[in-house]
Structures are given as C-alpha cells and as structure tokens.
Amino acid sequence: MSEAASESRTNATEYTVSEISGALKRTVEDVFGNVRVRGEISGYRGPHSSGHAYFALKDDRARLDAVVWKGTMSRLKFRPEEGMEVIATGKLTTYPGKSNYQIVIDNLEPAGAGALMALLEERKRRLQAEGLFDAGRKRRLPFMPRTIGVVTSPTGSVIRDIIHRIKDRFPLHVLVWPVRVQGDTASAEVTNAVTGFNALAWDGSIQRPDLLIVARGGGSLEDLWGFNDEALARAVAASGIPVISAVGHETDWTLIDLVADVRAPTPTGAAEIAVPVKADLEATLASLGARLKAAVLRNFERKRQAARAAARALPSPDQLLALPRRRLDEATSRLGRGLSVSVDRKRARLQGQRLTPATLSRRINEARTLTGRDLARAQAAFFAIVRERRARFARTATRLSPAPIARRQKLQADTLAALARRQDRVISLRLERLRGQLSQAERLLTTLSHKAVLARGFALVKNADGAVIKQAADVVSGMALTLEFADGTADAVATSGAARPKPAAKPSTKAKEPGNQGSLF
C-alpha cells in the first residue's frame, strides 16, 4: 500500500510556479471569458493619469477586484462613483505576480434606474440641506443681455435650435463653450465651462456673458447622469452669472435644474426665456411713442388754449405801451436839456481856468510837496517797525542766552538739594521717634508679661489640658500638673486635694520651725 502511494506521487505531473499560474490563468479565462457581475463599487480610484480606473465589486460576502481600461472608460455612458450598484460585463483573469484574480470590464451599467435614483435622491437631500435650492438665492435674469454663453455640444440639434431661436427673436452675440454632454468626462467638462465663463473679465478681449444657458437634448437617466454631478451643481450654484438650465425634455429633471436660477423645459424654451422678441419690443416702443406724442400734443393744445384765454383778458398792446411811451418821451427831452446845460457849465469852467505855465508849475510843486510828505510818513513808519522788531529780537536773544539758562539750572539744583537735605532730616527724626516708641512698648510688654513674675521665683501651675489653675480648690488629689518656671517646666502630681487654711494673722515674727512647714500641694 505504501509502495503504491509512493509510486502515485512519483507519477504526478510536476509544475513550476509559472506553469501552474499560467495554467490557472488559461483555465479561468476559458471558463469565465464573458461574465456579468452585479455588485457595489468600492474603493473607486480613477480615472488615473493613464486613463485607467481601478476599484472592486463587492456584496455582503465577497469582493472582486476590477479594472476598466482607458478605451472602455471613454465609452461609458455614466461616471462610476463610490457606493453605486452596477452590473459589470467582462472576463475574469488572474495576475500571476500576486496569485489573485480580477475582472477586466468591457461594459459597465447601473444596476437599474432604482440605484441611480437612490443616489440622486441622497445628493438632492444633501444639497437641499445646504440651502442651494432656496428661491431666495436665485437671481433675476437680465431683460436684454448683450452676450449669452451657451454650454453644450458643438454638434447636434440643440445648439442649432438655440442659435436659430435667438436669431429669430433678438439677434445678439452668442459664445459657445463646446463640451461633451454624455459620458464619463461630461460633468467635468460642463463644470469647467461654467467656471471658465465666470473667470472671464468684464473688460477682457473675450466679452463676458451676461447670461449662461446649459443645454442638452433628452435621454434616459443614464444619458443625463453627468448633469447630476455634485461638483457641477455646486459650480452652477456659485456662478456669478445667472444660469438657465435646459437639460432634457420637460419631464426630465437633474440636479442643475434645481440649483439654476431658471429651469427651461427645452433648449428652445431656454432661448425664448433668455431674450425677448425684437418685433414685440419694436411694436411696444412704437405704441408707447404714439401715446407719448398724443399726450404731448394734448398738453400743448391745452396750453395754447389757456394762453389764448389769457390774451383775451389782457388790454391791447397800445394801451399797455401808452404810458411807458409818454414817460420815455419826457425822459428823452429832459436828457437833452440836461446835456446842453452840463456842456455849457463845463465849457465856462474851462475858459475860467487857463492852463498857463505858472499854473502847471504850481500844481507840480503842490504834487511834489504832497508826495514828499507821504514818503516821509512811510519811511518813519517803516523805521519804527524795524526798531520794534529789533527790540523784540534782542529781548528774545537775552532770554535764550546761556547765562540765564545756567543760572536757572543752578537755582533749581540748589532747591532740589535743599529739599533732599530736609527730607533726610525728617526721615531721621521720624525713625528716631519710632525707635523710642518701640522701646517703650518693649518695656511695657516685659512689665506685663508673666515671664517677669516667674523670674522673681514664682511658678505657674497648669492642669493636663494646659489650663492655668488659679485656686487650691481646683486641685484634686492625684491630678497631673505642670509647673512652669522661668527657665522651663516640670511635671508633678498633687498628693492632697485641699490646701491648708490661711491664718488670719501672724502671732509673732518668730520663724517657723522647719518641721511645721506645710506642703505646697
């Protein structure tokens, strides 16, 4: 039996690690060459700079690594996201370098509209909680924009419909930012377009739009999924330029419809909302002009009738001018007579004052005299001012000379030194008085202290609690006592509880015999 087992092991095919890994790879790829796997996206990383995306598909019991190559990513109808439930179509393969397996995805689609709707509702709740859908933050559209920016695909019927509708209603300048409106990069391109239009300067070479239209034709939920991107919704909400959302048909809705300032049912409807009808405006202006002209004419006719009525109430011009004409004639006559009289008077005065050389010489001398007197007065006043200013400068120079300043400094220094000496004397006297008071207090304390009494040979008796015993009646036989002397304390025990009665008076001055002396305790 043992020999058979040994022979069986010897006859088993021997593989190298590379051979067995290759055999497993071929087996897996042959058996699972085309599979559909349903799971939740986990650990989504991508697309990387290479264009590939790596993640895992998982359920509640297992996990499967997955990869989407660059070419497949560009064909996807939606952008994969973390937590999204999808159905992946592809083939299983192994990676011999790490002995693991993965699915290479050829197609990826959401696991039904329910999964996308659940994700969309979750985003909607989050953005609504932040107030991005509030009507109070939405801006009014300009009535007549000069430039409109359109974010859409450069090909297709959407851009043609918008431009055609604007041209029919009110031709103006249209800027088109071409983007993809479907696929994995659609949301990023539309986001960049919205932020790019907002980054344009008002006085730049490219005219900044007054209004933005983000448009796309109709489609399924998966086709419109790029317009449900959270980053795009936030960019539209933060736009400084009013935005009209025109994505899909009237029954479709996306996140940017909720954050945009106005939602149009269709791209054509967005163009109709964006600009008024030029013919209607012209008709309105013509009507208003006619009404204004009629109002002006009516007002003019009223004023003319009022002027005519006032003219009829006024007297005739001849009656109004008769009195002023008479006054003018009288004034003219008086003026002529007055001029004649004045000329005659001036002529007579001139004849009476002949300009002889003597007269001219006298007048010149008088003028010289007056001029000399005025000049002398001016010189005297000038020199007086100069003397006063010199005296003022001299007084100022005297006050600012070094000698008075030095004297003032010396006086202040002497005063300060005298004050310092007085302060020292006051402090010394104060200290001496305080020392005397301290000595008196010390002597009084010594006099009143029981230490002085103890120093004269007395003792202070205390019980065990430290209380002073003042009477013999307070002593009990056997009581523990403490005797305090001037140089220390001693413990003692009372041998009797009553003291001897004190004699009323001494019978004689004879000293007692030593044997008759009573006990202190």
Curated annotation (Swiss-Prot):
Signal peptide: none annotated. This is Exodeoxyribonuclease 7 large subunit. It comes from the Bacteria. One of its GO terms (molecular function) is exodeoxyribonuclease VII activity. Its EC number is 3.1.11.6. Residues 494-521 are annotated as: Disordered. It comes from Mesorhizobium japonicum (strain LMG 29417 / CECT 9101 / MAFF 303099) (Mesorhizobium loti (strain MAFF 303099)). Heterooligomer composed of large and small subunits. Keywords: Cytoplasm, Exonuclease, Hydrolase, Nuclease. InterPro entries: Exonuc_VII_L (IPR003753), Exonuc_VII_lsu_C (IPR020579), OB-fold_nuc-bd_dom (IPR025824). The keyword rRNA-binding does not apply. One of its GO terms (biological process) is DNA catabolic process. Pfam families: Exonuc_VII_L, tRNA_anti_2. It is an enzyme of class 3 (hydrolase). PANTHER family: EXODEOXYRIBONUCLEASE 7 LARGE SUBUNIT (PTHR30008:SF0).
